[in-house]
Amino acid sequence: MPLLDSFTVDHTRMEAPAVRVAKTMNTPHGDAITVFDLRFCVPNKEVMPERGIHTLEHLFAGFMRNHLNGNGVEIIDISPMGCRTGFYMSLIGTPDEQRVADAWKAAMEDVLKVQDQNQIPELNVYQCGTYQMHSLQEAQDIARNILERDVRINSNEELALPKEKLQELHI
């Protein structure tokens, strides 16, 4: 099985909250696509609660678009990581990490302004696969934590696992 890009970085040295360019590529028509690792939690030390990350998934996607789309950038998708330590964001364009960090912080401010669970987009049986598994309070706790700690930049060069270590770990 091929080694995915996300597993070539040392998760024991990853900071959080932090932005990292996980991958860049071009479409056959030459459009740049960038995938960002938006790391909310320190891997193997913290984890977002399932109800909170689910609610955040519903809110974060729209709020990030409000703050990041434009000037050559259009978000394709924002999805939670299975390990519940962050989100992957795929977009058209190549914004720098600081622009993404600023949009992320603004989106977290927006999450804190949501006053009622009824304001969560697509929170119904028709548009959500587990519409009863939500917590606005947990999502706001996550947002507050991000804003209190600020958002840093994780560098691929600093986090790269040495080739020898990758060979040792590869099954």
Curated annotation (Swiss-Prot):
Cofactor binding annotation: Binds 1 Fe cation per subunit.
This protein's UniProt keywords: Autoinducer synthesis, Iron, Lyase, Metal-binding, Quorum sensing
Coiled coil: none
InterPro entries in UniProt: LuxS_sf (IPR037005), Metalloenz_LuxS/M16 (IPR011249), S-ribosylhomocysteinase (IPR003815)
Matching Pfam families: LuxS
Domain of life the protein comes from: Bacteria
GO MF entries: iron ion binding; S-ribosylhomocysteine lyase activity
Amino acids binding Fe cation: 54, 58, 128
Catalytic activity: S-(5-deoxy-D-ribos-5-yl)-L-homocysteine = (S)-4,5-dihydroxypentane-2,3-dione + L-homocysteine
GO terms under biological process: quorum sensing
E.C. code: 4.4.1.21
PANTHER family: S-RIBOSYLHOMOCYSTEINE LYASE
Family: Belongs to the LuxS family.
Function: Involved in the synthesis of autoinducer 2 (AI-2) which is secreted by bacteria and is used to communicate both the cell density and the metabolic potential of the environment. The regulation of gene expression in response to changes in cell density is called quorum sensing. Catalyzes the transformation of S-ribosylhomocysteine (RHC) to homocysteine (HC) and 4,5-dihydroxy-2,3-pentadione (DPD).
HAMAP family reported in the protein's UniProt record: LuxS
Record-given protein name: S-ribosylhomocysteine lyase
Organism whose genome encodes this protein: Escherichia coli O6:H1 (strain CFT073 / ATCC 700928 / UPEC)
